[in-house]
């Protein structure tokens, strides 16, 4: 995924189907300068982590 699309998803009120390492996640914030996103698994909101945006996959 690219940074622009990750930012669109993070800003959208519509939930997108995005995964990180095969796990469904929620994108909380995107740092466009660093190319990283703050995410958490849908089933564990307290497990926040920063990951490269390129490692995120969007599924339709």
Curated annotation (Swiss-Prot):
Q: What conditions trigger expression of this protein?
A: Expressed only in the forespore compartment of sporulating cells.
What's the short name of a Pfam family annotated to this entry? SspH
An example Gene Ontology biological process:
asexual sporulation
Region entry Disordered: which residue ranges?
38-60
Which compartments is it annotated to reside in? Spore core
Query: InterPro entries from the entry?
Result: SASP_SspH
Q: Which UniProt keywords apply?
A: Sporulation
Q: Got a GO cellular component term for this one?
A: endospore-forming forespore
Which NCBIfam families did the record assign? PRK03174.1, SASP_H
HAMAP family according to UniProt? SspH (MF_00667)
- Tell me its family: Belongs to the SspH family.
| Name of the protein this chain belongs to | Small, acid-soluble spore protein H 2
